[in-house]
Regions:
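A positional/structural detector of protein chain ends, strongest at the extreme C-terminus
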Residues: 1-3, 433-434
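Signature for phosphate-centric chemistry
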Residues: 21-156, 160-434
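Cleavable N-terminal signal peptides of Sec/SRP-targeted secreted and luminal proteins
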Residues: 3-21
Length: 434
């Protein structure tokens, strides 16, 4: 072969290789996978970093009540086992047969999952930082209410009986008072079935009719059988070289991508390279459907059972209340989502169903229930009477029934919006299996 022909074919092979790499290589900045990780989305994606002082003419904050989801955590024991076994086997197949560029293959080659079972669901350093920084920003917004000196007549903290909620509360306290001052904080004894922080744990009827009801997952099953998901499954079987790749396997890969993305903003999980901006939306929508029907508006009982938390909110926000000025609860996704629905937030005009994919919808856990998601209500004393500021993810939100042209809602109007739901709250009756 002549030198010119050799150079020509060499150039062609280099060009083809570059084109192939451009097509296959995962680009984290371009795909923005981290915005579509449902309840495993890191809080940094949704956080409001503008922490300027919140002021309203002639008004000053007097009381606050908040619900905080724990920060970024480890997977469950079952997930840890499957990641260490199933995904390790699949990683080896991908290295042998997968259609990935060299850079992505190298990420699989160096991937090493080291978690032990006894670390299941533990809060991780990123989760601690989420709560510390969140507390600092809230304190900056309301310095005249969230004082940096702890007093148990002013502050009330409570968490569920889990390591991740306890550590989240301690991290939040660190952000408010400093690392050397948190030992003086008093916490009430944590309860496994806390009637406010985890009300659904004490609702047998919800467990039977919703949580354990196969019909509640019908829309998820229908979407998993749709052309959208089946094409994704087909593409991933081809890309990975795993011929018998199942829907559960794909979900495990998506979940692992989510956890590893949430843990460290500087590291790209190899499992994220299986997805594109479009295909990850398919995985996200499966989660949207599940959390809509299990924890959202799918069944009335799901959010009606949150009424004890609603009653507690008004007991603490009441401008004449003698309870501590600031009440902070540290809990879980299941509580936050149900309470969002109880408040009437993010309700779409039509129920979310499998055919809703591709359209706009408000119920998106990636945005409303990321790790460390939060709801905060602040009572203000104003010349015209008490008013309430409602905030979700550190931004003002309009509660249905309140005016949408101002962040502040008259306390009387705010209370009236929930009066029927709170006054008729008979938790034991609604949760009894008849």
């Amino acid at each position: 072969m002549s030198t010119s022909k050799f150079l020509f074919f060499t150039l062609i092979s280099v060009i083809l290789k570059e084109i192939t790499c451009d097509i296959i290589c995962f680009n984290a900045e371009e795909e923005r996978i981290e915005q579509h990780l449902a309840t495993k989305t890191p809080y940094r994606v949704v956080a409001n970093t503008n922490d300027e002082k919140v002021t309203f003419d002639e008004c000053f904050p007097t009381r606050a009540w908040g619900i905080f989801r724990h920060g970024t955590r480890n997977p469950s024991r079952k997930q840890i086992f499957r990641i260490k076994t199933t995904l390790t086997q699949y990683r080896d197949i991908i290295l042998e047969k997968g259609e990935f560029c060299d850079r992505d293959l190298e990420r699989f080659r160096t991937w090493n999952f080291q978690l032990d079972d006894d670390e299941q669901k533990f809060l991780v350093p990123e989760g601690e930082d989420e709560l510390i920084e969140l507390a600092e920003r809230i304190q900056n917004r309301f310095p005249d209410l969230f004082f940096d000196q702890y007093d148990n007549s002013t502050y009330k903290f409570k968490y569920t009986d889990t390591q991740r909620a306890k550590k989240s509360a301690e991290s939040f306290a660190t952000g408010l008072f400093g690392r050397h001052n948190i030992k003086q904080i008093w916490y009430p004894k944590a309860e496994k079935k806390d009637p406010i922080l985890r009300f659904y744990k004490g609702c047998p009827r919800w467990k039977s009719e919703v949580d354990k009801n196969p019909d509640a997952m019908e829309q998820v099953r229908l979407f998993a059988a749709s052309d959208h998901f089946l094409q994704l499954l087909k593409n991933l079987r081809s890309k990975t070289g795993i011929e018998d790749l199942s829907a559960d396997d794909v979900h495990l890969m998506y979940t692992t991508c989510a956890f590893e993305t949430a843990w460290d903003r500087h590291i790209i999980s190899p499992w994220c390279s299986l997805f594109t901006r479009e295909s990850v939306k398919i995985m996200e929508f499966l989660e949207d459907l599940e959390y809509y029907w299990i924890d959202g508006f799918g069944y009335d009982l799901t959010y009606r059972q949150a009424c004890p938390a609603g009653r507690n909110m008004f007991e603490h926000l009441d401008p004449y209340s003698k309870l501590p000025n600031i009440t902070l609860y540290f809990t879980h996704s299941g509580t936050l989502l149900k309470y969002l629905a109880f408040l009437g937030l993010y309700r779409d005009q039509k129920p979310l169903v499998h055919t809703s994919f591709g359209g706009e919808h408000s119920w998106r856990p990636s945005k409303i229930d990321a790790f460390a998601s939060n709801l905060l209500f602040v009572t203000f004393s104003c010349p015209t009477g008490a008013k309430v500021l409602s905030m979700h993810q550190e931004r003002p939100v309009t509660i249905p029934g309140c005016p949408d042209d101002t962040p502040l809602c008259d306390y009387a109007v705010f209370a009236e919006a929930f009066r029927e739901r709170v006054e008729s709250c008979d938790f034991d009756k609604m949760c009894t299996i008849s």
